[in-house]
A protein has these predicted regions:
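Membrane-interface helix caps and helix-loop-helix hairpins in membrane proteins
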Residues: 20-25, 44-53, 75, 98-106
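Hydrophobic cores of alpha-helical transmembrane segments in multi-pass inner/ER membrane proteins
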Residues: 8-12, 64-72, 114-125
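N-terminal signal-anchor/start-transfer transmembrane helix
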Residues: 6-22
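Membrane-interface capping segments at transmembrane-helix boundaries
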Residues: 19-24, 125-138
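Loop-to-transmembrane alpha-helix initiation sites
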Residues: 103-115
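Structural signature of hydrophobic alpha-helical transmembrane segments
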Residues: 1-9, 51-60, 110
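Cytoplasmic-side transmembrane-helix entry/capping segments in multi-pass membrane proteins
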Residues: 25-34, 55-59, 79-87
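Small-residue-rich segments of transmembrane alpha-helices in multi-pass membrane proteins
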Residues: 32-44, 66, 89-95
Length: 138
């Protein structure tokens, strides 16, 4: 429960920070890079290099999307990036069914799910308020 509450706070702080630094054009897209990287980091902390590689392979779509949408102006990018955040939240909930990563703290999946849900939901809301739902115009 505390992981969900802290996750909600971190999600809101992420949105507020992006707005304060006027980073909505790039922050959410580049944030996609961190999602698989954290799981890989947990694996490395546990001394499981092969698991870290697997985490990054599974996370390649997030890395590619993050890089593309951070630097390229694309219509509906707020929607696509928001969906990627929401999909990662769902992945957090089922992650242990795909990969055994002993380095992942027990509190992390629900924490990350809530952060991802807050950020993804905000991006879908934002998509209706910026021209062409283009993050580069936010």
């Amino acid at each position: 429960m505390i992981g969900a509450i802290i996750g909600a706070a971190v999600g809101v702080l992420t949105v507020v920070s992006a707005r304060l630094i006027r980073g909505e054009r790039w922050l959410y897209s580049l944030g996609l890079l961190t999602l698989p990287s954290l799981y890989a980091f947990f694996a490395l902390q546990a001394g499981e290099q092969a698991v870290a590689v697997k985490e990054m392979i599974y996370g390649l779509p997030y890395v590619v999307a993050g890089l593309v949408f951070a630097f390229v102006s694309v219509r509906q990018s707020a929607v696509v990036v928001g969906i990627f955040w929401l999909l990662h939240g769902l992945y957090d909930l089922v992650h242990s069914q795909f990969i055994t990563n002993t380095g992942v703290p027990g509190w992390y999946p629900i924490f990350c799910f809530v952060v991802d849900a807050v950020v993804g939901s905000y991006l879908l809301w934002l998509s209706r308020r910026v021209p062409d739902a283009n993050l580069r115009r936010a």
